[in-house]
């Protein structure tokens, strides 16, 4: 075997020779690389390589050959094909071979080697290299011999007939061509950049603990027969070479145990020390101590023995105690010639082992920041293997020791970081498993807690684990019961800290205890009593943690119990050395339990690292417990909801007597109810007539027979729907009836049924009747502001979703399913129509859909049969029906508007009372005079644009548009009168919008004399005057209606005359008044000084006289003074 020289030029070290075959072939020199390239190019084995290259023997390991193959493949990908035609290998197919197999042919004069089978002198690895080389050469040959014309021809054939090419590949392609194609595809794939750190970490995690403890370059891991030989080779090296070789030995070691063993063995070789010990720094910044990682290690001590002995007898040395402790505290080296003469030396170990310590050299190990991470100590210098008690460590030994420990400090810190990363990796894997368990075991709290405790015990290596759960009263007691159980205390009462602690202690009562013992013991679940908890020391510690919310790490249980005045249970304290106890909290930072670890396996206290890991377990435990409890509570609430729905369904369903009565009633024709007219009104219908009218609509649409709806089921459903409407002022059952009638009129009179299927007509009528079920008299914004359960349940279109859910609830009630005869597909279709139609009554949805609908109309749409088009059309029809009261005759419209206003005003009162906010104008009772103006705005923004586009597209529904226009004129007229101060809104209904004179039948109406003072409108208000601060709508109506000349305007005179002379029913005037205007003088001096608080105005006084004729009989008695006051108020 050819030797590879060491970097220093000397013989190979035994450390290098003791490595495995995989680690022996590390990096190739330039010569080796050149050899690999020449071999890949076809140079036969045994050929003379280029200068500076190392020969590759025929007996090389397969690992090296694989590496060379890989290197050749990568270099071939990045190197252009050779252009030397004379030395090319040619790819030929021999005649008579049907499989198309090729063979390598070399030019004359070159040595040829058969490629079919390797020669007996060739190894399989060499044959594989040659086979790989042949394939690469064939690919290079193919790429150089093919002309561009051939490539274009093949490409054109492939593009024109790809199916034929695929068929040729699958049926007739030679195997070699397929393998070459596959190889070409593999070579074209991008290579992933190798990550040494990631590969090393994955190899480390995948290896067994036995493999992980082995050092690939460790002298101590060599066989017993090779140790003297290795030591002899190391002794042959000079000091510099030996130093560098031992540094390389520890440079890449990541296992902390193996690294420490290497350091002590190598230091013994460098300083001729008999044995050594290595201590690592642990603890917090305020309480640091040394832990003996390996103790009394000689050059012959095996790694396993050293680790076992250190684990069995863990030695802890505080900083500042003993020789090693002083070195760690002062960071100064200590060199002692005679140990027994030094007061810091502890001879107990010598007495115990029988070994005598003479010379000691102790030196600190620091990291790059200068912090102490360990202390190395060597004992008793030897001379060539012979121990002489008088020998001491000289300055040269100290310098060698210091230099070597500098490199060792880097290695130790790297190994510690790697150990931390491995620990974090394992912890993350466990936490991922815990997260998986939370989802898998969310319905079983016992299994979940048991899994968490098992993982915590195995990771933290403790003897026992316990979890205490606090009684939270989750969803068990009602609010009233909680108030009675815990009455409110006065806010000013002074509470002592002890009282507060006791109150918290009583509040955090443990109800469930989970205990997990040894490895093969099952978890124990119990419900301890109050007496059992009070007599247990472990329970008292858990109670303290639950009350304070603090983590407790107890090293001495007896001392802690004495300091905190807790009950001391002898049987528990005797078996307990260390306790780590931590609160378990939910998302609201409320303690829901306590997790407790008892006794680490090696008898040492729990460290801060243990507490950090255990904190993650506590968080996941809290998440799992909270999730499980929420799941259990959700199941209970769902069960309660089912019971409540059953009760609600029973009480929401119409009684059997009512159903039978309606079933037997005679249903009048549609004309008698005026169902075909857009001017339908329900004022004259009693409640039973409203139900009969609904039944008639279903009959006229032929829905009962078409969908085989049982008549008694339909009657019960109509009565149940009526029963589930609340008695609010507007959004009640009668509003639903009017909406359904308008839909019926649009379908029949408006001829919209020609665009709908029978199933869609059924869905639209059901949606109209159910679109405001269980309306509370408040809108969606109010539900959101008050954070009502409905707003939490439905984030958008709150009330509309609730209406649909109520509709579904009634349909699912026994004896109310009018869709029971439908097929599953028809049932899904009609329910989709009902849902979409009900949600479309939300004006927010109307504004979203309006633009798309207008776009369809502008594009001349006439079919309306697509799914999206039909949905838009149905949505616009639902909105048109929902606001159809605006198109009713005026005597109906203004009464309905007053009902709507009263319902809005009630909501405004609730906002003032509950939310302490100022409602908007339409809901503010104090601004009721603005109702006509707001009605005009509502018509202009929503109603008229909708009815106009529907009327243009479907001309048969023009009455809706015309009625809306007429009502807009009436509301505009009323708004102008209110603005001029000629009327006010203070009646129960707006049936008498203007106060009028009523003539008496038996009293002669005499002239009424009154004066009207007109102010000079040309006079500008002085700055700071009272009039300048008066709102415009609160100023005198006469002033607002005057012209600059002081006379009443023409529009005002016509409106005043109409109001005074015409009655509400449009009959002839009952009274005749003559209104005389006075001439207004404008001789006021604009520059005359006036008082800011008393503005001066001038004008002439005019007399107005009114003569009346005899009034008709039936008028009211009105005295003279009352008439005068009313007329003055009007003006």
From Swiss-Prot:
One GO MF term attached to the UniProt entry: metal ion binding
Residue positions bearing lipid (S-farnesyl cysteine): 1128
Bias kind Basic residues: ranges: 1121-1131
Cofactors that this protein relies on: a divalent metal cation
Domain GAF, residue spans: 255-412, 444-625
Chain residues that bind a divalent metal cation 2: 772
Record field: catalytic activity: 3',5'-cyclic GMP + H2O = GMP + H(+)
UniProt topology in membrane: Lipid-anchor
Positions of the propeptide segment: 1129-1131
Keywords for the protein's UniProt record, in alphabetical order: Cell membrane, cGMP, Hydrolase, Lipoprotein, Membrane, Metal-binding, Methylation, Prenylation, Repeat
Cofactor annotation comment: Binds 2 divalent metal cations per subunit. Site 1 may preferentially bind zinc ions, while site 2 has a preference for magnesium and/or manganese ions.
Comp. bias intervals (Low complexity): 42-63, 110-136, 1097-1117
Keyword Lipoprotein: yes
Family: Belongs to the cyclic nucleotide phosphodiesterase family.
Subunit structure: Interacts with PrBP.
Its biological purpose: Has a role regulating cGMP transport in Malpighian tubule principal cells.
Name of the protein this chain belongs to: cGMP-specific 3',5'-cyclic phosphodiesterase
Organism of provenance: Drosophila erecta (Fruit fly)
Gene behind this protein: Pde6
